[in-house]
Amino acid sequence: MEEQVANAIEIAWNPSSDQALKAQAFDYLNQLRTDPSGWQVCLALFTKTPQHSEIIRHVALEVVNSAAQAGLIDPQALGYVRDGLMNYLRQVYGQENANPDPPNIQNKIAQTITFLFSALYGSGWESFFDDLLSLTYKGASSTSPDNMLGIVFYLRVVNSIHDEIGDVLVSRSRTEQDRANSLKDLIRMRDMQKIASSWQQILSEWRDGNDLIVEMCLKAVGSWVGWIDISLVVNQTMLDLLFQQLARAQKAELRAGEEKVRDAAVDVFTEIIGKKMKPEDKIDMIIFLNLDTIVSQLSNSPPLCENRFTFKYDTDLAETVAKLVNSTVVDIVRALEQENISAECREKANGLLQAFLPHILRYFSDEYDEVCSTVIPCGSDLLQYLRKVSKTDPSLTAQHSPILLPILKAIIAKMRYDETSSWGDEDDQTDEAEFQELRKRLAIMQQTVASVNEQLYIDAVSEVVATTFENLRQSGAQLDWRDLDLALHEMFLFGDIAVKAGSLYTKNQPNNQAAERLIEMMSRMVESDIRSFTHPATQLQYMEICVRYSSFFLYHTNLIPGVLESFLQLVHHPTKKVKTRSWYLFQRLVKQLRSHIGNVAQTVVQALGDLLVIQAEIPTEGADGDEMSSEDHEGSADAVFNSQLYLFEAVGIICSTPTVAADKQVLYVQSVLNPVFMDMEKNLAPAKSNDERALLQIHHDIMALGTLAKGFSDWMPGTSSPTSLPAPEVSEAFLQVSEATLVALESLKTSFNIRTAARFAFSRLIGVLGSRILPQLPRWIDGLLTQTSTRDEMALFLRLLDQVIFGFKGEIYAILDTLLTPFLQRVFAGIADPTTGTDDEIQLAELKREYLNFLLAVLNNDLGAVIISERNQPMFDTVITTIEHFAKDIEDFTTAKMAFSVLSKMGSSWGGPDIAPEATNGASQQVALPGFAQFMISRMSPLCWALPATPSFNPKDAQAKQVLAEAGGLQRTIYCKTGMEYIQYLRDQELPGMGMGGELIEEFLNALGQLDLKGFRQFFPVCTAR
């Protein structure tokens, strides 16, 4: 069988094997993993002499591991595995061996041995560490660990055991953690002293003999120190050995691999400091270890001092030392935050903080961002501590300036692009993203500095910005773009303390001193020659700042023309990223300054003309794949068009300013509209033939037309009817837009994209056409709600129609009367369509709710008569039936609750005047619909009991209670409209028919007659729960 398993492994992992044979081999091996006796064959395969090939031995041992972890090997058999492996280890690792196992096999054996440790160390292999330590000696006569192979394997297992039971980053179940804690206790009790002694012996014996052994040993010390007695590591013998390894940092040249030993030695000190202990003990430990001196010596070592700013600079060591600094300062600050530490400890901690401040600044200002990022946590903790102290005692703020100012200057300096950066280079997108992420972290630290000492922050940033603009004035385009970008970035962040409620001003005065300074900065920036902003990054920053602080221009209107001119240059920028972003920023700027722009429409339309040409591009295959980066997406055809829409909106905004005469508005609008109309006409025929590019072109055209309308009026339907429509001649021009869109929609209504664009245009045209659009409403509905329209589309259009009803309730009755029946028939068809998945069900629920919302909009806006008009009377019963169905839906409480709301509103609208004593439902009184009172009693009232009568109904469910409260509201409405007739019906028919007892019936009727609406809504859910 051994030969059979070996052959199967060879076939499975041989690239040239026949695929069918390979599949059989894998099936066989998978069966072997679950076979209770399979591990025995594989253990024999692994330990066999002469040895099988590496892949056979690796897979064989993997099967043994798998069986052990799956519980296929009982404790007695685990002892057999232990004995077999230990015999193998003594043969191969217990003596000099010319052909040692490769690292992957060593790791696999260590993994198996670690599992056996977990299973048997408590009971069955108490001599575990003695057995492994025996491998580190060549023979009985050896007085110190002298067997290299055995030492490496021993350390491999020691590190593996830490990973298994000591690593705090590994997620464990409660049971696993309890077992790990138990094993750690046993180690501490039985073997920890001899393990620590073995480390000392190995480091002493091999300190210069084998870098791999020393590195592995240091890693073991560093990882185990967190959960063992600290004195086993922090003692003079061990510290001397550690300092010997740290001395490697002073070498100008290291042999290959030696740097790993040096870094591992530094990591041991970091782990010692990271060990949990009382604040006083931690501060004393930092002083005892003389970490300030250690860090100073490391910082002044050749790799970090002489080689700094050269290609030889050792970033790995810099990052390793930065971790030590970070860990130490975090603990110093943590001690200072404790209110109950002694005055002596606080004094020591403050002294350490002063000593470590240069170290923080050294690594924080390191030119490599990964080094800087390593000390950001401790810098943030320090600043948070200073903020807390300054709030408790403001008088200490000035004392902290010597700490704060150098940190703030370091933060600002680190915000600057370094000399090697090349902004916008496609090859550096990852670096750019990482730098922007670093800037965000630095900005948070900067805000904390400002919260500790705002004046210090204001002065520091003001100085940087003022100096930069002065240099710009003197040297112009010769100024390094990185310096200008830094100043602009700081200006952008400065608004966090200067801007209040979106403005720099309150009651025509600057908000505060920060706002005053920022206004000065803005003046310097805007009055600078834009041609000096030669780099795309600074040009983009310029626009972002103008938009963020647009309130500045409201008080400096003389500067607006110059800024507009700058923007009109930048919207033609050759860099796509800058150009497309500038289109959005231009729209934002003109929207915020709409009333102060002046009559510049002709200039703007002419300047933007070439950018308003719409060029639809079919997305290339795979453009939607997961591999597309955000940068790629910004440059995609779809993203570019979406940015282009901002230009159309900007044109609408500028052309509709009060300073532009109505006839000129029409002229400018027509100059934008006519090319789009011509393009639509040209593409309509091929689009009808399903030409993909033509369809997309018309989609883009319609979106552009709708967006232009949006620029003219930012009124959104649903707020109120447009209070200031454009001049009649302008509205007439947009009627052409509506007509052109409808023509395209009527021809291409089977296209989802065309319907989507048309729905958007419709919503925007309302704002410029007002009630003029109402006569076209039937055509819009016919085009937007087709046989192929999704439920989602119907729901969106219903929501839009609600807003139209609200905005034009005085003028829409006749049109609504004409279109209601065919419109609702399409909605009912959408509701009736079967669902095929979760997405369908979600869309169906949304459509139901929007349908009920539509009915409520009609009723709430005094248009209820349209539902029962002569034209729509035949549809009325279907309307009621759907509402009844929704009211009984136990799967959708939200819809059920709305259904009861609609029924209550119908009762209020058509039930006639209130006749019950003291009935006050707040509804406007309307003429009674003949027969509706009886209809409410016979059809609506029984619905209130349908849900609670359902076997699966849970009256304690929060949503269920809300539905029942709404049902109670309906009953109260019926009572208000019908009075004693309803009471009599309930007493004689409905309640007894449900099996309700006489006493409960009287209690229910008393509550209905005596409680107000709110009281009965609360009573009904309680009543049904009995």
UniProtKB/Swiss-Prot annotation:
Assigned GO CC terms: cytoplasm; nuclear matrix; nuclear pore
The entry's keywords: Cytoplasm, Nucleus, RNA-binding, Transport, tRNA processing, tRNA-binding
Family annotation (Pfam families): Exportin-T (PF19282), Xpo1 (PF08389)
InterPro entries: ARM-like, ARM-type_fold, Exportin-1/Importin-b-like, Exportin-T_C, XPOT
Biological process according to GO: tRNA processing; tRNA re-export from nucleus
GO MF annotations in UniProt: small GTPase binding; tRNA binding
SUPFAM superfamilies, sorted: ARM repeat (SSF48371)
Keyword hit for RNA-binding: yes
Chief place where the protein resides: nucleus
Cysteine disulfide partners in this protein: none
Location of this chain's protein in the cell: Nucleus; Cytoplasm
Function in brief: tRNA nucleus export receptor which facilitates tRNA translocation across the nuclear pore complex. Involved in pre-tRNA splicing, probably by affecting the interaction of pre-tRNA with splicing endonuclease.
Family, as annotated: Belongs to the exportin family.
UniProt name for this protein: Exportin-T
Gene: los1
